[in-house]
């Protein structure tokens, strides 16, 4: 008997985005996403803030961008639906560093983010997309539970190796319209799907192609069949789902987690409340 992951509300697909470097063009990007109910994770380097008081460029109508200052960063991301995550303190090539400095880069960035936003920061994206097994081990020891690579699969698979997490595609991928159509097509009775889009918002300014993300948000947003989530929300939900406990015949399922979890056995989705045991 199949027991298929379903996202909150019984949905069979989820969408998440990831954007790097903490630049001023993240602000109009968030405005576009917010208008369509889409959530993203923004990965920042807390040693690279711009000086306070610098003029704010118009990154929508010009190609000019810059990093946000510390005060601007808090004002931009705090009290929004979006997540702020680690991108390492100084945006280094982590795989070229000894383990002690990798740990320093990750932990200091994490501590700064937590102090700025009052959160427990557990997510990350690799600067330059580069890493090795030593880096992965340092992340695990530093309390990081997922880290996005720059690998684009062109698929909607649910992550398995969260510290080497790939994306579906970059927003400049020529396959983007086709992938959106594939994702929006109904596939009843099939495994859950995750669309993961990544990039840098300054690319929209530098290339003056803001229409790409506007069109994407208009097409993919506001859909009752899609769960819109940050990276950490996807991680927490999928990890909780994988902790479900099954009886020997698979028909009795216990949810030991704090989340309400949904699954399907081929028909309608079933919700298993936190701490509950259900018969299917």
Where do the PLM segments sit?
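A short acidic, amphipathic alpha-helical/loop segment
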Residues: 28-32, 134-138, 212, 216
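Hydrophobic "anchor" residues on beta-strands that sit immediately upstream
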Residues: 16-17, 83, 226
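Catalytic-core region of carbohydrate-active enzymes that cleave or remodel glycosidic bonds
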Residues: 137, 141-151, 171-192, 214-220
């Amino acid at each position: 008997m199949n027991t298929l992951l379903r996202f909150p509300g019984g949905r069979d697909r989820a969408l998440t985005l990831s954007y790097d470097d903490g630049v001023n063009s993240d602000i109009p990007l968030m405005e576009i996403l917010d208008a369509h109910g889409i959530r993203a994770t923004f990965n920042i380097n807390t040693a690279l803030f711009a000086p306070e008081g610098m003029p704010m460029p118009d990154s929508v109508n010009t190609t000019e961008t810059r990093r946000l200052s510390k005060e601007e960063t808090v004002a931009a991301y705090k009290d929004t639906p979006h997540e702020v995550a680690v991108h390492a303190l100084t945006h280094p090539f982590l795989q070229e560093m000894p383990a002690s400095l990798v740990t320093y880069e990750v932990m200091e960035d994490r501590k700064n983010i937590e102090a700025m936003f009052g959160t427990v920061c557990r997510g990350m994206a690799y600067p330059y997309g580069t890493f090795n097994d030593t880096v992965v081990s340092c992340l695990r020891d530093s309390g990081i539970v997922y880290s996005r690579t720059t690998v684009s699969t062109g698929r909607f698979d649910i992550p398995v190796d969260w510290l080497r997490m790939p994306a579906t595609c970059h927003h400049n991928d020529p396959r983007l319209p086709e992938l959106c159509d594939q994702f929006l097509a109904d596939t009843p009775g099939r495994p859950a799907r995750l669309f993961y889009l990544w990039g840098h918002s300054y690319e929209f300014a530098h290339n003056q192609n803001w229409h790409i993300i506007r069109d994407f948000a208009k097409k993919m947003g506001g859909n009752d069949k899609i769960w819109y989530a940050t990276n950490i929300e996807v991680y927490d939900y999928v990890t909780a789902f994988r902790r479900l406990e099954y009886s020997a015949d698979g028909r009795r399922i216990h949810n030991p987690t704090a989340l309400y979890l949904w699954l399907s056995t081929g028909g309608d989705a079933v919700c298993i409340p936190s701490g509950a045991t259900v018969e299917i």
